[in-house]
Amino acid sequence: MKITQLPQEFIDAQPILTKLEDAGFEAYFVGGSVRDTMLGKTIHDVDIASSAFPEEVKSLFHNTVDTGIQHGTVMVLDHGTGYEITTFRVESTYTDFRRPDHVTFVRSLEEDLKRRDFTINALAMRHDGEVLDLFDGLEDMKKGVIRAVGDAEKRFTEDALRMMRALRFSAQLGFNIEADTQKALVDLAPNLAKIAVERVRVEFEKLLLGSQASQSLELALRDQVMNYLPGPHIEDWSSIIDDLNKDQATNYTVAWAHILSRTQFDDKKRRQFMYDWKMSRNVMKTVNAIVPIVHNPKKSTVFDIYQVLAYQEELLEVLSLTGSQPETIQRISHIIEMLPITKAADLNISGGELIRSGILTPGPLLGRVLKKIEYAVVVGDILNDHDALEKFAKEYVNDQN
């Protein structure tokens, strides 16, 4: 099969392949860029595999970087763009369920493609668009099937993360997982507990953003994959899956906030869940801010909304995902639009001014007064006017005395 209209990313990289070929080596585009082009999806970068060994690649191109030379990868810099060229290779045993103990460079494309995870990812393409399909990946693509290359049990034993990748591709592409591949996933799911949490999280986040995330979550639950994922156990995924049947999160922060909004975790358990998944501080901060409001949106006050203003987009999206009433979302949107200030710095008076006017001196009381002023302005008790705020501060200090 030949692709007649190549994306620009391939066209830009064609000189790299032809230079390798002119020197007597084989060179192909491989991996996700070929798969996604066949599926009509946008690609962002390309991967190149070649029979040239790393030192041979470096001798051909003047501007190179050893990005992973021990695994056969050299980056070639061409007109400001970096292209990773990886030597055809075979891999040894995987004692850590992640990386091969060692790799051996070979001259055979078939031997290289044999080690890849799924048939849809084991396609190679010549510089002119001719696609080489040694493992029926095109047929599996046509059928909408995710099938391991060769022995599924062997592929998943080599790298347990491939099980999460199977579920992720199912979510992203809407493909079914082939029966033998699915059986191996069920049998070897316990090995997921041996994989670094960060690697599992990246795949799970991609799954959650897939158009068929609900389908993949149902598979993961049915096959008890969830039992080997990090964090306190979520007893009931049904409402999460129902939500994702209707819509998807636009980013992984929203995805996590959505999941945790649908659990009955208390604050401590929610924090433990995020810690176990090794989420970033920014994600934790966002989730902790908006989940309490999503749990009780009708009871949220103007000041509650003001306090999470920095996360308003995430809040409104999670409210929509969880099926909050339109009038509830409209009310919160209206509160956001009508807020007199968006942050304390918007107040028309400062701590320095209160000190210079003699109303206050530096100390804890100053901080309390500024907090009181901020609250009063936000809820509409006073206007954000300098004189009004100064008067409010004086009265508050007098009351305290």
UniProtKB/Swiss-Prot annotation:
Cofactors (names): Mg(2+)
Pfam families: PolyA_pol (PF01743), PolyA_pol_RNAbd (PF12627), tRNA_NucTran2_2 (PF13735)
Catalytic activity from the UniProt record: a tRNA precursor + 2 CTP + ATP = a tRNA with a 3' CCA end + 3 diphosphate; a tRNA with a 3' CCA end + 2 CTP + ATP = a tRNA with a 3' CCACCA end + 3 diphosphate
Chain residues that bind ATP: 32, 35, 116, 159, 162, 165, 168
Signal peptide limits: none
Assigned keywords, A-Z: ATP-binding, Magnesium, Metal-binding, Nucleotide-binding, Nucleotidyltransferase, RNA repair, RNA-binding, Transferase, tRNA processing
Keyword check for Metal-binding: yes
Enzyme class, spelled out: transferase
UniProt superkingdom: Bacteria
Chain sites annotated for binding CTP: 32, 35, 116, 159, 162, 165, 168
UniProt keyword Endoplasmic reticulum present: no
InterPro entries: Bact_CCA-adding_enz_type3_sf, CCA-adding_enz_C, CCA-adding_enz_firmicutes, NT_sf, PolA_pol_head_dom, PolyA_RNA-bd
UniProt binding sites for Mg(2+): 45, 47
Matches recorded under NCBIfam families: PRK13299.1
More about this protein: A single active site specifically recognizes both ATP and CTP and is responsible for their addition.
Subunit organization: Homodimer.
Full protein name: CCA-adding enzyme
